[in-house]
Amino acid sequence: MPRKRKKTHVLIFLAFYQTIWKLFSNFDPRHATPPATNVTIVVIQRNILYNNESTMNTKIKKTLLTVGLSSSVMLSMAQTPSATATTTNPLLIPSTLSYGAPDFNRIKASDYLPALEAAIAQQRKAINAIAESKQTPTFRNTILAYENSGKLLDRVSSIFFCVDEADKTPEIAATEKAIMPQLTQLDNDISFNEKLFHRVKYVYDHEFAKLKGEDRRLLEEIYKGFVRNGALLSKEKKTRVEQINKRISDLQQQWGTQLQEATNNAVVWVNSKEELAGLSDADIAQCEKDAQSRGAKAPYAIVIINTTQQPILTNLDNRDLRRRVYEASVHRSDGTGRYNTLPIVVEMAKLRAEKGEIMGYHNYAAYSLEKTMAQTPENVYTFLNNLIKAYRPNADKETAAIEAYARQTMGPDFQLQPYDRFYYSAKMKKAQLNLSEDEVKPYFNIDSVQVNGVFYAAHRVYGLNFKERKDLPTYHADMKVFEVSDSTGKPIALFYSDYFRRPTKRGGAWMSSFAKQSKAWNQLPIIYNVCNFAQAPEGQPSYLTWDEVTTMFHEFGHALHGILSNCQYNTLSGTAVPRDFVEMPSQFNESFASIPEIFNHYAINSRGEHMPEALKAKMMESINFQPCYALGENLAATCADMAWAMLPSSAIPTATQATTFEQESLKKVGLLDSQIPPRYFTSYFNHVWGGGYAAGYYSYLWTEVLADNIAMTFKQKGALKRTTGDEFRDKILSRGYTVDLMKAFSSFTGLQQPDAQALLKMRGL
């Protein structure tokens, strides 16, 4: 959930406020003013990194991390001037909290829209001042001024979009609908501001060769960002791109709202406890709680999560109920009426294809991939085809084995259906390994996993320490806040965790930030993770499945990428890297969950007992039990994404043809398999249609290869050695996008190119 991007083309910098900034330039983060806050943008691309379990992170819209890649950020509250000297809006005045943390005790839903509009107005003024300047353009008066503009808007929007994703009430949704067109217009106005671009180009032409290090990188990213956004196009083409950007923004906002409503509406109501046979008492209690929170149309409710398959099917004995749950998931938003998202899909696909063509590319995929490590669609397909070749025969064997096992109890004519797979796979695992989820789950208390697992691993590897800050307010009572310090005790960041699901939170898991690290701004990071774990009834401890344990480690890997950043400029810091690199730190961090010394430290039951060695051995053996499903669902989703992005604008199917197109596309690559469907079907593929992963979902597999190579290098050098962690931190995690990422990868691993065999080996294939 790498929340993971286009940069904020806007930043506010008025000379009058330089004095204010200086007043706070030497702050003590423990007591006063803070670092900045990150936002999201494409206009405002939300800088959110999604977990594969999510639906991530955000672009003008909700794009997590987008094609253009640099994420925007904002200065800390204390460093950010208010829009007016007399305002009482808490979003427009400096925070007095540690690190400049958002003061959620004072912020009301009604504050967001006026604050956003005031910040937009201020940003326009700052950009116009740069564009209309009569001074000869220089790195300082143009590039740094541009980098420093928009701090107020970044601050306000980062807070708003966090709440918009995690606690979307009707009033918040209305604010999003009202503000997105204004943000899109602002982004377009900046992208196509000819005077501004001429100044940027002048600096690029006259100073690029003279600059070094991060200064040179910053200039290059800003200049190329303008070019990729259409600054060199004719006036007619600029106008059309502007129209496309506006329409896509509207469609993504509509998509997000509609999909959340569709998913909430897809709840499966259950009339009796007997129908829930097979579920644990805790799961049944959760179904009862979910029913009460959704109007209690029946005593129990099964809530649909964002992915195609639903984890609850693993233990649900009632086959007809399993079918109902699966069909509710698959068809949540592909029917007729208000929840059908396919008309949005086809319109957005056509607009993206047209934009790619206007920019001079054959399709949107070619345009989108140019700024990534993969670079071209051909390279992506070569990568995918090699994986499919190894995967396909193993997948067929895996499915046949599960069906054969089911027929032992159900009879020789039993036909395995997709809603049966998790159920019989789990029974087969228990029979072969004598292991069930119910045996291991009591050892994964959510607090222990976080403190004794996730935090402990970061302490062992990077020397980090964590102290809960109960004095800092949050936007929801379920959240926790931690101050992060290094091995010397020096505070370096704040970390917020929001782990439990609720009706107002969209599905999935992600990372983003209220503030990104920047030495130029004397700014420390304020990072957050959001997940959707089930919460136990009040007064009882909550427990995680193994998949959820790895999700927590995954999202904290993104968080570490932000926490350990050590860059000059906020545009280049932290997770502001191509999306096919940004998922590497998160996927790599998952590997610590199963390292014995870490595992033994957090896998403890309510009696304080560690997981028995025999049970632990079986659980570790089960991690790669039947590995094809997880790989196959990702391959299928990736190929569906690429199929849409490869189409020219003249070949986009209609809404009624969309499902057939998806099936035919999967059939062409050997992935049309009812037993292993895509992780997300098109109609609810939020990464692609609501986020920034169009032509980019391959990034999860691509970065898994990088992560597996990194993990093997750690194993060789000493997985828990501080020297290994410090080297990884210095060469990769702290560097943001200030270095050549392939060179950084090679420097740490000693490999000239990533070795894809590592992925197959780690998955047991």
Explain the meaning of each model-derived region.
Residues A534-M552:
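Short pre-active-site segment immediately N-terminal to the catalytic Zn-binding motif
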Residues A83-R106, A118, P299-A301, A431-L433, ...:
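C-terminal, non-catalytic "cap/extension" segments appended to globular domains
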Residues T66-M74:
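Bacterial N-terminal signal peptides
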